[in-house]
Amino acid sequence: MKIISPDNDSIRYTRRVMPDGDLYFIFNEGNKATEFTADFDKVGVAKEWNATDGTLQPINATIVNNRTRLTIKLEAWESKLISIGKSNREYNIKEYGVKGNGYSETATLQRIINEAVHNGGGTIVIPAGEYLSGALFFPRGVDLRIEKNAKLISTVDPNEFPVIPTRFEGIEKRWRCAFLNFDHSDGVKVYGEGVIDGKGVEWKKIPFGNSGRPRLLCFTDCPGR
């Protein structure tokens, strides 16, 4: 947890990393009430524990730079227990405007991914059918499920695969991005019975150049659980 504003030396906290999210015990050691804004090192849905009935109640949060941002009020000597867990919401791409008509739908797919992040994460679902796309970027908190008889197919267009700072064969360098890119996504899952088709044979016809060809998948700083 990092306090953004205002500076406050009366706040203490402990964090416990759980399989389904993180728990934060936050305590005001001061003798005055305080309000502060803090970033939590997790993308997810924020809830506060109600000490009266033992339930977790949703609280307002925003996602900023791959972290969950909260504004918290604490009375003198008051403590709160905050839970931040990955959303179980699913985003079926067909329900969000993807057509699967043989044309590249990179922008629409990326918009769905970004919407999921904005809402605290979740799972992007690729249903049965064939879907064409350029490079996609999955921020923290977003999983990918490719269902049976579904195929996510790469375009063979260098313009849809920008050259970015990345790591290639253990060396930090500028290189063409992968088809599916996951960055700082702790516990991310890519699963299902469908197919990810990177069109490797077709990409071999594109000159390697100084920036290479796309990889199929790239996980950067993505520790498991």
Describe the function of each predicted region.
Residues 1-88:
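Carbohydrate-binding surfaces of carbohydrate-active enzymes
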